[in-house]
């Protein structure tokens, strides 16, 4: 009754009287409260959170704690927080998460369109009118004033996108999410049913042995990778499973029925007939999930349009309660999608899906998965990409940014993307400037120059920017020696500017990590070159002290700032440091295998290290990245034979392998070492095995053997691949790789 009476009174004010007679609303004067925070007796959880947030931050600013009440006796003034009436929503086209902030008769009204609109209205009030900021979890700017007032206003704001996720560690923080107007996955999706759910619904461990026909037919053979979606038993199993799971989570509306993370879709006659009719492997998927959507009309069935299933079907339209999760994983990140010739197929695909689907959930990628701490200059494409996606009907967004301390410009990118998700047409440069000035204070001019230089350098070339790319790919462009030197000069000045402010200095040092990381990785790629770790002269090798110190400095900053894993595979700074120290400990002097010839049977995959067998004896041990200094074999056994060139008294023999399960790379099952004096008759000197399921292994493993006696010329390694990914792996049963590097003989 109170709320309705107040609203009725306010509606008697004309728009002109509002403009002419309103004055600023004083809420605190000399530390004394002049208003209360008014909520409805039936306030939603969001309204209560909004009221508490406003109370907390006004106290932080002014030292005055406003009371929260459900009743105000005239003539007392108030800040009201509640859901707008239906007629107000219709008049202002107010939608879920939207809000109105208005003033009238020395009162302030924050009216929600539903959802978290009241929280976001409070955030707007704190940011725009009271000067507060939250740049990262725990990093706030709070001005201090004993008196506070709000100018007269009538401000309506709605989100351009109805669901907004920026993935990463930062958004695990609820308060940070609220300040950035973001959602969490759990707000929409059933727990355990977000993506890649085929195996959860029809686990191969349960069914494959007795019913291989439930799974993909590839090259005439049934494999575990995907489901056969034209098999009626598969459909019935999925229906039964979903009914049981939905009973456990009755409040959850969106359920993912989506392909596993591989390319092995079914090629049986029935599936191929549909694929040919639809012109896309998405055909069987959409027909399958449409049946489920009809079976569960009160739920939403989410499915992927990803990699092989990205092109839209030509015949079948998704039902209204089917969500299309469209992914951009293949695209170049240096140019806006709609302006890049290499992205034309995606531009066509999103247009095609937009013609047949009303519920598109866009999964975009704004991070380098393999080298999250390396420079990844994509700030200039974030706004045009989100503008393009939103204009093409994608209003639910998952931005996979993998935000964490130490990831390249992580705090800035999360801050900018959040605001672009709410309003894609904001002034992005102003947002960047606001962040840089608030986060870096006196160091801001130099950080801004660094950002500008990175962007201008990649715009010059328009080179491919890959979400799995290695810094070496850009060693002659934005990561050239001259550019790295310029960036370092800026960071030197930035550190000097804030040397008396330890907290700000730490932020500057963390933002310098990507430049240090790139220099280390580029140096590792050419150990004996001009940017490498060693100076070579007459077969002697001297470690450059400045490069060694660079590794130490990088690791120290990581430790001091609790830097999160350095890539998607969870590489810890300590592991990276140890692997790098191992890497730069070149195996040259006393190494009989250095630059000697190796033959392989069969040959390694040419897409890694160009299949160059000389990498196995170049004196450099591979580190954590399979794309640098490693050679790979997929799902097979192989042999490597080293020719020392002449008979020698070899005693200790070793070979190294890599472990990166997210990239489907495991250590081999076993390595057998054999030696020979003539290359014809070999004798075994040892066999080493890797036991267990390889769920947790060291990143690198050295297989060490001892030759008990006699001169040898040839060394042969017989390596048994693991071949199939183990049961614990998300792509269990898929082909696994073995990656091998440095052979050392002493």
Q: How should these model regions be labeled?
A:
Residues 420-601:
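Catalytic domains of carbohydrate-active enzymes that cleave complex glycans
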Residues 17-100, 146-154:
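Acidic, contiguous N-terminal accessory segments
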Residues 621-686, 699-746:
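Aromatic, loop-rich ligand-recognition surfaces of beta-strand-rich domains
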Residues 233-236, 244, 344-445, 449:
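Structured mid-domain segments that build the active-site/substrate or prosthetic-cofactor binding neighborhood
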Residues 50-53, 57, 88, 92-287, ...:
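Feature activates predominantly on carbohydrate-active enzymes
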């Amino acid at each position: 009754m109170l709320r309705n009476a107040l609203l009725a009174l306010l509606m008697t004010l004309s728009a002109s009287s509002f403009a002419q007679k309103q004055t600023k609303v004083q809420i605190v004067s000399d530390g004394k409260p002049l208003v209360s925070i008014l909520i409805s007796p039936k306030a939603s959880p969001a309204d209560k959170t909004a009221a508490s947030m406003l109370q907390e931050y006004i106290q932080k600013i002014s030292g005055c704690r406003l009371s929260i009440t459900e009743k105000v006796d005239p003539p007392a003034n108030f800040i009201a927080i509640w859901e707008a009436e239906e007629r107000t929503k219709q008049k202002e086209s107010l939608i879920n998460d939207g809000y109105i902030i208005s003033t009238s008769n020395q009162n302030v009204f924050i009216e929600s369109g539903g959802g978290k609109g009241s929280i976001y209205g409070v955030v707007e009030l704190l940011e725009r009118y009271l000067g507060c900021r939250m740049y990262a979890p725990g990093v706030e700017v709070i001005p201090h004033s004993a008196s506070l007032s709000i100018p007269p206003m009538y401000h309506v704001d709605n989100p351009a996108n109805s669901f907004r996720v920026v993935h990463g560690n930062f958004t695990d923080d609820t308060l940070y999410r609220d300040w950035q107007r973001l959602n969490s996955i759990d707000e929409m999706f059933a727990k355990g049913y977000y993506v890649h759910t085929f195996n959860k619904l029809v686990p191969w461990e349960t069914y494959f042995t007795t019913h291989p026909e439930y799974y993909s037919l590839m090259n005439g053979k049934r494999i575990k990778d995907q489901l056969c979606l034209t098999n009626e038993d598969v459909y019935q199993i999925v229906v039964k499973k979903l009914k049981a799971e939905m009973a456990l989570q009755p409040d959850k509306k969106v359920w993912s029925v989506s392909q596993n993370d591989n390319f092995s879709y079914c090629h049986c006659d029935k599936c191929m007939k549909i694929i040919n009719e639809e012109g896309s492997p998405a055909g069987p998927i959409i027909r399958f999930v449409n049946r489920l959507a009809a079976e569960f009309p009160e739920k939403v069935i989410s499915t992927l349009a990803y990699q092989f299933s990205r092109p839209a079907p030509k015949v079948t339209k998704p039902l209204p309660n089917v969500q299309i999760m469209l992914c951009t994983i293949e695209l170049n990140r240096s140019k806006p999608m709609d302006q890049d010739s290499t992205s034309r197929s995606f531009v066509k695909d999103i247009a095609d899906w937009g013609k047949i689907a009303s519920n598109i959930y866009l999964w975009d990628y704004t991070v380098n998965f393999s080298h999250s701490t390396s420079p990844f200059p994509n700030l200039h494409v974030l706004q045009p990409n989100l503008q393009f996606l939103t204009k093409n009907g994608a209003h639910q967004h998952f931005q996979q940014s993998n935000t964490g301390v130490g990831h390249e410009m992580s705090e800035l990118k999360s801050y900018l993307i959040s605001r672009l998700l709410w309003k894609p047409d904001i002034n992005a440069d102003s947002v960047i400037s606001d962040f840089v000035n608030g986060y870096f204070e006196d160091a801001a001019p130099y950080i801004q120059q660094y950002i500008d230089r990175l962007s201008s350098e990649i715009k010059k070339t328009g080179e491919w920017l890959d979400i799995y790319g290695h810094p070496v790919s850009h060693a002659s462009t934005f990561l050239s020696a001259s550019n790295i030197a310029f960036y370092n000069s800026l960071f030197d000045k930035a550190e000097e500017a804030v040397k008396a402010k330890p907290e700000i200095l730490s932020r500057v040092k963390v933002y310098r990590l990507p430049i240090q990381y790139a220099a280390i990785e580029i140096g590792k790629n050419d150990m004996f070159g001009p940017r490498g770790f060693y100076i070579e002269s007459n077969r002697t090798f001297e470690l450059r002290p400045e490069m060694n110190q660079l590794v130490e400095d990088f690791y120290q900053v990581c430790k001091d700032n609790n830097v999160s894993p350095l890539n998607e595979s969870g590489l810890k700074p300590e592991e990276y440091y140890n692997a790098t120290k191992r890497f730069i400990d070149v195996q040259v002097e006393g190494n009989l295998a250095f630059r000697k010839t190796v033959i392989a049977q069969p040959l390694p995959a040419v897409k890694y290290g160009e299949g160059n067998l000389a990498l196995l004896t170049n004196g450099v041990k591979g580190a954590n990245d399979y794309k640098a200094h490693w050679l790979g074999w997929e799902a097979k056994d192989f042999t490597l034979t080293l020719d020392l060139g002449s008979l020698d008294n070899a005693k200790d023999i070793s070979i190294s392998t890599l472990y990166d399960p997210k990239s489907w790379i495991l250590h081999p099952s076993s390595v057998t070492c054999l030696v020979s004096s003539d290359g014809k008759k070999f004798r075994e000197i040892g066999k080493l095995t890797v036991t267990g399921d390889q769920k947790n292994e060291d990143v690198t493993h050295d297989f060490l053997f001892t030759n008990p006696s006699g001169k040898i010329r040839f060394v042969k390694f017989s390596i048994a691949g693991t071949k199939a990914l183990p049961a614990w792996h998300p792509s269990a049963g898929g082909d696994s790789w073995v990656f091998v590097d440095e052979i050392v003989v002493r």
